[in-house]
Amino acid sequence: MKDSYISIVIAYLMVTFILVSSMPIEGEKGELRPHRLSCPPKYASYHCFNGKCVHLVAQDEPGKPYYSCICDKFYIGERCDTLDITNPDYFLKGQSSTQSSI
């Protein structure tokens, strides 16, 4: 009985999460936040140095393109051009392979 109740609660939470995560999110002034699309090829190749270029489409200005970067791990900056050595994981990145071979 307890197991079936837990299964029902878990299923309910999963469905709720899926429904909520697929809903559009409103910004501070009530406008919808932009959707992400892949960058056009002419921007994708040079806009982000160490990351992925995304094309943002603002719903209040659909004709105006915005380009942004989603940086790879350990990189920061507007164009992912700065190595983030302040990230503690940066110094641990090589240790996992060393420890597993011992």
Curated annotation (Swiss-Prot):
Source taxon at top rank: Eukaryota
Alphabetically ordered keywords of this record: Disulfide bond, EGF-like domain, Neurotoxin, Secreted, Signal, Toxin
Subcellular location per the Swiss-Prot or TrEMBL entry: Secreted
Signal peptide per UniProt: 1-30
Cystine bridges: 39-53, 48-69, 71-80
Molecular function per GO: toxin activity
Domain annotation EGF-like: ranges: 43-81
A GO CC annotation given for this chain: extracellular region
Tissue and organ expression note: Expressed by the venom gland.
Database matches in SUPFAM superfamilies: EGF/Laminin (SSF57196)
Similarity comment: family membership: Belongs to the EGF domain peptide family.
The protein's name: OMEGA-ectatommitoxin(02)-Rm1e
